[in-house]
């Protein structure tokens, strides 16, 4: 099975399965000399970990990270950084009834057809459990970007099912389990999720992510455009079915006189481009939105087939997120951080000595 590595100069290779002894990743290409300890990574993992509210999976994983290599006396050495997260609360017996059947909307059928073998325990390699190593690697990337450029990456839930979540303030995001930027709407979200869980069903979500303090010049046209790599990484998150950069699909209805962000000596007027022009960062906020589909593992009876191709009815029991989007915010933030650090290192390698007389204008005009 290939396709387990992200990045060019700053690479992340993840490993493990949902019900295996451990999951983790190996980071290669991290610059030396950055202060790093397990607490730096644990903070981000705690934002993603399961069992934090009644609205997410009740699997109780501590998600305690162990740094196995690449850090000496509290600093990165430039060697590969191996990060390990042990699985401690597997309940594989919950999946015995789907060993020979395929859950609708899940990777069961395609994994079986492609590899001829499938770890049915919690989805194995296809499980959202494997986003934990991504978040761990993203914590390293976030720290380097923050210290090098002052880059800050924050996300929030913009919609839960048919409920739009109007943005009020970033301060609200860390105060509720939905990562909602609006405290007043949280009771409505809780009521909605309680009813959904009672019905044995699931729902999708929309997550917005913003990276501020991104330097101008990141991105490699034509096929390694910054926005192309962002979309590639975001689609690598379990259950993501759509990605928008900037105005995204709303650009269809915008005229050029509106969509094109004007430049003035004082700064850009607007950011419909989402901080990327021609595949290269403008120095403005990089804005990304992702659509997350409903969880495939639900108690509602669904039609499917077994390995023999015979019709069956599938009901999935066990501990599942009725909406994986609730815990997706730190995952999306991490993916964006991994793309940005990789392109920052690539830009430094090729164009670090480039200088032009044109001044860099502000991200937004006053």
Swiss-Prot record:
It catalyses: 5-O-(1-carboxyvinyl)-3-phosphoshikimate = chorismate + phosphate. GO terms for biological process: amino acid biosynthetic process; aromatic amino acid family biosynthetic process; chorismate biosynthetic process. Its EC number is 4.2.3.5. NADP(+) binds at residues 48, 54. Pathway: Metabolic intermediate biosynthesis; chorismate biosynthesis; chorismate from D-erythrose 4-phosphate and phosphoenolpyruvate: step 7/7. GO terms for cellular component: cytosol. GO terms for molecular function: chorismate synthase activity; FMN binding. Transmembrane segments: none annotated. It is an enzyme of class 4 (lyase). FMN binds at residues 125-127, 238-239, 278, 293-297, 319. Disulfide bonds: none annotated. Its cofactor is FMNH2. Reduced FMN (FMNH(2)). Pfam families: Chorismate_synt. InterPro entries: Chorismate_synth, Chorismate_synth_AroC_sf, Chorismate_synthase_CS. Keywords: Amino-acid biosynthesis, Aromatic amino acid biosynthesis, FAD, Flavoprotein, FMN, Lyase, NADP. PROSITE patterns: CHORISMATE_SYNTHASE_1 (PS00787), CHORISMATE_SYNTHASE_2 (PS00788), CHORISMATE_SYNTHASE_3 (PS00789). Belongs to the chorismate synthase family. NCBIfam families: aroC, PRK05382.1. Homotetramer. This reaction introduces a second double bond into the aromatic ring system. This is Chorismate synthase. It comes from Paraburkholderia phytofirmans (strain DSM 17436 / LMG 22146 / PsJN).
């Amino acid at each position: 099975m290939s396709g387990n590595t992200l990045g060019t100069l700053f690479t992340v290779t993840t490993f493990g399965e949902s019900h295996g002894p451990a999951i983790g990743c190996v980071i290669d290409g991290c610059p030396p000399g950055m202060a790093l300890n397990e607490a730096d990574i644990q903070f981000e993992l705690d934002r993603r970990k399961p069992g934090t509210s009644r609205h997410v999976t009740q699997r109780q994983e501590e998600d305690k990270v162990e740094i196995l290599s690449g850090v000496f006396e509290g600093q990165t050495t430039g060697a590969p950084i191996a990060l390990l997260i042990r699985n401690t609360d597997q309940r594989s017996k919950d999946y015995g009834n789907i060993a020979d059947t395929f859950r609708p909307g899940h990777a069961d059928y395609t994994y079986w057809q492609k590899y001829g073998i499938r770890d049915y325990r919690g989805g194995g390699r296809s499980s959202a459990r494997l986003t934990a190593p991504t978040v761990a690697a993203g914590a390293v990337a976030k720290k380097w970007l923050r210290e090098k450029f002052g880059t800050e990456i924050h996300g929030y839930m913009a919609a839960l099912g048919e409920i739009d979540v109007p943005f009020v303030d970033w301060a609200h995001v860390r105060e509720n389990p939905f990562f909602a930027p609006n405290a007043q709407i949280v009771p409505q979200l809780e009521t909605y999720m309680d009813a959904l869980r009672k019905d044995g069903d699931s729902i999708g979500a929309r997550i917005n992510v913003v990276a501020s303090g991104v330097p101008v010049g990141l991105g490699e046209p034509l096929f390694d455009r910054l926005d192309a790599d962002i979309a590639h990484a975001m689609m690598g998150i379990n259950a993501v079915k759509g990605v928008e950069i900037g105005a995204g699909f709303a650009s269809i209805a915008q005229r050029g006189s509106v969509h094109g962000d004007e430049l003035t000596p004082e700064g850009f007027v607007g950011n419909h481009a989402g901080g990327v022009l021609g595949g290269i960062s403008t120095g403005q906020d990089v804005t990304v939105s992702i659509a997350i589909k409903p969880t495939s593992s639900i108690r509602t009876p669904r039609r499917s087939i077994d390995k023999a191709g015979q019709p069956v009815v599938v009901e999935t029991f066990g501990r599942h997120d009725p909406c994986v989007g609730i815990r997706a915010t730190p995952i999306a933030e991490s993916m964006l951080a991994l793309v940005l650090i990789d392109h920052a290192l690539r830009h430094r390698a090729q164009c670090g000595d480039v200088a032009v007389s044109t001044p860099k204008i502000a991200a937004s005009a006053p």
